[in-house]
Each structure stands twice: as C-alpha cells, then as structure tokens.
UniProtKB/Swiss-Prot annotation:
Top-level enzyme category: isomerase
Protein name listed in UniProt: Type 2 DNA topoisomerase 6 subunit B
Stated role: Relaxes both positive and negative superturns and exhibits a strong decatenase activity.
Positions that bind ATP: N46, D78, T99, K100, G109, Q110, Q111, G112, I113, G114, I115, S116, K473
PANTHER family, sorted: DNA TOPOISOMERASE 6 SUBUNIT B (PTHR48444:SF1)
GO molecular function: ATP binding; DNA binding; DNA topoisomerase type II (double strand cut, ATP-hydrolyzing) activity
GO biological process, one term: DNA topological change
Organism lineage: Archaea, Methanobacteriati, Methanobacteriota, Thermococci, Thermococcales
Protein biosynthesis found in the keyword field: no
Amino acid sequence: MAEARDLFKEFKVQSVSEFFRRNAAMLGYTGSIRSLTTVIHEAVTNSLDACEEAGILPYVRVEIEELGKEHYKVIVEDNGPGIPEDYIPHVFGKMLAGTKAHRNIQSRGQQGIGISGAVMFAQITSGKATRVITSTGDDEIVEAWVKIDVQKNEGKIVKKIKHPNPKRWRGTRIELEVKNVKYVRSKQGVYWYLKLTAIANPHAHIELVEPDGKLIVFPRSSEDIPEPPVEMKPHPKGVMTDDVYTMAHRSKRSTVRRFLVSEFSRISDKKVDELVLYIAALRLINREVTDQNLKSQLIERLANGEVEKVLKSFGRKWKKVVEEVEKIMEKPPEKLTWHEAEEIVEAFKLMKFLAPPTYGLRPIGEENIEKGLSSILRPEFVTAVTRPPKVYSGGIPFQVEVGIAYGGEITNSEILRYANRVPLLFDAGSCVITSAVRSIDWRRYRVESFDNAPLVVLVNVVSVHVPYTSTGKQSIASIDEIYNEIRLALMEAARRLAAYLGGKYRRLYQIRRKKIFEKYLPEIARSLHILTGEPEEKIKEYFLRLIESKITVAQEGVSEVEVEEGEA
C-alpha cells in the first residue's frame, strides 16, 4: 500500500491563469469561429465601457488581417481615456482583476477575466505577446508587449518603448496574433457581433476592416452618451453570511451598527434596532424551544412582523438577550464572529425591507433602441418597451427592455439577445430570453408564424449582476422574475405591432376593393350607357366620385408590391 507522503508528491497549487489556460473553453474559446468572436467581444466591450465611464462618445475600429490558414492578427483601437502605464500589466495580464469585478455596479464585463483571457488565448495559440499602444492624452505614448506568467497569474511586459505625443492622442490600441480561428460572415461571426453591438449602442461609431480589406462602417445614430452607471450598496436580502463577515472585517467603520447603516442599502439606525430584536428572538427560540412545530410557528410569526409579541412570550428573559445583541452592534466590525454574521443574515431573511434602489441601472432606453434598430435594420415598423426596474433573488436589481422591428429590409425572424448591451451569440437554447420569446403565442398578435415572419425581437437584460449560466457569459439563467418581466415587455410591444398590422391590413383591404371597382368600371359604364343613353365619361366620373367617397384609404406603410401580390 502506498504511503500518504508518496501520494502527495505530485500535489501542486494551480493559479487562476493556469486553470483557464487548460480550460479556455469555459471562457468561450471553443471552435474556430467562436474563439475569434470572443477575442473581439472582450476587446470591444472593454473599449465601450472605458469610453462611457470617461464620458466619451465611443469610436471603435476593428481590423482583422489574415496571416495564414486559421491564423489572424486582430487589431482593436478606441478613443477612450487610455491606460496609465503602471496598470498595463494588470489590465492585460492578470485574471480576476479590473475596475468592476469587486463593485456592485452595472457593466458589460463583471468577472475581471475578459481581456486578459484574450491575451492568454493569443499567447497559447501563437506564442506571441500582445502589443498595447496607449496614452492618457499626456506627452507620451506607451508601446508595450505583454505576456501572462500563468504560474503567478501576473502580467509581464517583455518590451516597452515610449514615444512623444505632440498631438496629445488619447486612447488604446491592442494587437493580438491568434491561431486556430476562422473569419466567416456567419450568425456567430465577428461581423454579426459588431452589427448587433451597433444596434444596442447607437451612440458608438464602429468600424470593421475585414481580411479582404473591405471597410464596413456602423455610424452612430445618437449623440447622447449614456450616463455612467452608479455603484450600489448591497441589499440585505441579497447577501450571504460570508458577504457580511468579509465586508465587516474589511470595514473602516467604528462599530457594527455604523457598518450596517453605511455599507448596506435600506438599513437605517431604526432598522438596526429592529434587527437587534429579531436576532434576540431567534436566539431565544433556538435556546429555549425544542419542539420543532412550535419553533416553526414562532419563526413564521417573526416573518409576519410579530417580533415584539414573540419576545414577550419568553417572559423576562428577552430583555437580557436584547442587551447581549445590542453589545454586538457596538463592537468594532472586524471583531464580528462568523456565528454573529450568520445570525444577522438569518434575521435579514425574516425582516421586511424596501426594495433595493435601482438608480444605478442604465438601460438603453426606448428611443435609442428604436434608433438602433431603424438605422441598422431599416424596418417599416419599430417599437420599444422599457419595463420598470425589479429585483430577483430577493435583492439584486434588474431591468428588462424589448424592441420589435418588422418588415422593410428584414426578411426573416431573429431573436437578438443582450445582457447590459452586450450581444449574446451562443448557447441560445439554454437562455431565458429564448424561452420567453418562444413562449409567446405570436398568432394573437397577427404574426401567423414567428419563424417565417420578417420580425426581429431584441431583448436586453440590465443588472449589476447578470445571472449567466457559465463563465462564457453567453446565456442567462432561467430565473422566474426575469422570465416574467421579459414576457410582459414582449406582450406590450407585440400589442403595438398587432395594432400596426391591423391598420395595415385594413388599408390593404380598402386598396384592393378600390382597385377591383376601378377594374370593372369601364364595363359598367359601357353597359349603363347602352341602357340609359348617358355618356360613358359622365357615368365613369359619377362612379369614381362615389368610390372615393365610400372608400377612404390611407396608403402610408402599404407598398404597391403588397397590393399587387394581394390581387394575385
């Protein structure tokens, strides 16, 4: 039998970078087409986030050069705020690092993996460092070649050059060389990804230079820079014991009371006083009550707000226990124990709080959705709905918005899925957006067959924490609150589509009736001329006036082709 020491000879600590190097598929690097799209996605989302946080209208240029079979150079340049020199190795070479991952704030990226994952993918497929050119608008441009030390999860600058910046250029340009990828104009390729990005970000000017040198421009259709999202404090209903314990031990506040009031939303001094009573009641129930049925009844009464009655049911003991808990609230937060953090969270679950604030959410907006869909897809009809903010899992705010575009240059149906304005191109089958759209009975809204209709449905889920199904961030988990909000938004937009189509069909019917009458009018006039002796022209004029007075047609939105097809 082998000894324990022999078994552990191969024991090794693996860094985050090393883990993802071996499991790149978890980040979306799977398949030649998807891998290239993922590289572009990570770079473009970084650019858009940086521009918006700095209050800059984004200009993003993507160039793809073919170097060989399944071998490309990818260049992404933006006009953002630039990256300070000291942060270059951290931004591009350290996983789980960034300006957003640790904050309760809406953003396109939320894990701190994105662009460093792209750098790592380039490194393990081509062996080349990523070239970064950046300036914050000062008198220097920094050019650096970055690699990742996967064992240490650290960025390493292998070469650096500084250039003068007389024109005060500001922005960032990155160049990655990647292999085992392929550029195609498919629904999962780079072109389609950038097209969908332009729809959801009408304030951005996006350019794509394809491998054959063709330039494609998605011009901005809005000059309004989205307001930067605001960091929001966590809500008591959305935290776990570890959250409270970790936050308390990092807090600079003088007491647990001040920590709770200042670092959580919807908690005031009065609410802390109430929290003390709930913790005291739970302590008494756990200490004094052995009968499980009675224990369940008392906890149910707490959930119904009867905390004072429950406390008094224990006689004089309750005041002493309340004093014990009050002492916890006055001690330094770094001395909060795990058990005390557990008690706080258990009490939170039973207490009633106002819904978390949603001021930090930044939806695209109905007007901008309509602008984006109209400028890129050129439909005959477009509408958008932005639902009021809601919460899921007790305390995480989110918001749903929907756009519908119909007809015009649209030839087939599409579901455009977004999370915080970012297109989701893959794993559609497991996404709550797909299931919500498919659950709608579109025939009720004058769309006989969704799959065959010239109809595009856009759904954007906005949240400080989008519940993705995996680290690849391409599919949103099926959460009831989100599913229901998507359905409500879809039905509201679909009712507007039905009203438009109803009016269109009525106009079409009237035009067809008029054309039928006009078609047979010469024969009717000739016959009446023979019977009455009245001149044919006079009879024609009479009936034309009669037709005009009886059939009023507003032809807006109805093409001649549609009329002719209807007659056939």
